[in-house]
Design a protein with these regions (language model features):
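A mature extracytoplasmic/lumenal domain signature
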Residues: 69, 112-116, 179, 187-189, ...
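Short proline/glycine- and acidic-rich turn/helix-capping motifs at secondary-structure junctions
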Residues: 62-79, 134-147
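Short glycine/threonine-rich beta-strand-turn micro-motifs
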Residues: 40-43, 49-51, 58-75, 92-126
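N-terminal, intrinsically disordered, polar/charged segments of Gram-positive cell-envelope systems
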Residues: 24-63, 145-159
Length: 262
């Protein structure tokens, strides 16, 4: 049976959105994360290493669901509208704040990069409003007062520069291997800032990460690139903490580097 071009394109679009949503939800919700293979690149060689990588993020909670029962057709119609908005080239801050959405049993579940009551209302005003929309995750800000170490058994982490302009959206960090053996690192990270009350909280950053490992020989350095979203949450002057967590010699280690925005 030959499929008409329009039908084939619709099927491809649906599969693409499903896969992208699974990636985003897996990154932002531990309960939806799955075991993945971490691929190491050594020169031109590729080595597949089985490794569970679960990204720490927001706990999954549910808002009060509507008493109304929605049909699959109704939910699917909302999904199509959200897909068209999400794939639009004109990404507004409200759209950039959306990291994924999917169809539940009686709802459309939406994950936001910065999940506050105000941002939820912004979504309903600017993107789509329906009682079927339910927002995933704990409300921000999420407190994270952890501290890490800058060096552990020869593995060190630091920002490429000690300070950056206030409007910065991309920051690079250097991870260096002086452990005496090969070291493999990934791309997942988190960033915290200090609030007015003295507590540190998680700021909106990337929410999905490629499950790939980069291998450093002894003496080599690599780069981890982080992003900030000042159009979603304005950057404020001050010190920020960048975290990279890895298993080193069987120990769960939280590496930390600081940088300043001014």
């Amino acid at each position: 049976m030959r499929l008409k071009p329009k039908l084939l394109n619709a099927i491809i679009l649906g599969l693409t959105m499903f896969l992208s949503m699974q990636t985003a939800f897996a990154a932002c919700n531990p309960s939806m994360a799955i075991q993945q293979k971490k691929v190491a690149t050594v020169g031109k060689k590729r080595v597949a290493i089985s490794k569970k990588k679960v990204v720490k993020s927001k706990k999954r909670t549910y808002r009060k669901a509507s008493a109304r029962k929605y049909s699959h057709r109704e939910l699917n119609a909302i999904m199509r509208i959200l897909e068209r908005n999400f794939l639009s080239e004109d990404k507004t801050p409200a759209l950039r704040n959306v990291v994924g959405f999917g169809m539940g049993s009686n709802s459309i579940d939406v994950a936001l990069r910065w999940n506050t009551k105000e941002k939820q209302q912004e979504f309903r005003r600017q993107i789509y409003n329906s009682p079927a929309i339910r927002f995933e995750g704990k409300l921000d800000p999420i407190i994270d007062n952890r501290e890490g170490v800058s060096t552990y058994q020869g593995i060190s982490l630091k920002a490429e520069k000690p300070s950056y302009p206030l409007g910065t959206t991309e920051i690079k960090f250097t991870i260096t291997n002086h452990s005496g053996k090969e070291f493999m690192y990934g791309e997942a990270y988190s960033i915290t800032a200090q609030g007015a009350d003295g507590n540190w909280f998680v700021v909106p950053t990337d929410c999905s990460f490629t499950a790939i490992g980069h291998v450093l020989s002894d003496g080599q350095s690599g780069t981890i690139t982080a992003h900030l979203f000042p159009d979603i949450l304005p950057n404020k002057p001050g010190i920020y903490r960048f975290f990279y967590e890895e298993n080193i010699d069987g120990n769960k280690v939280l590496l930390m580097a600081t940088f300043e925005l001014k």
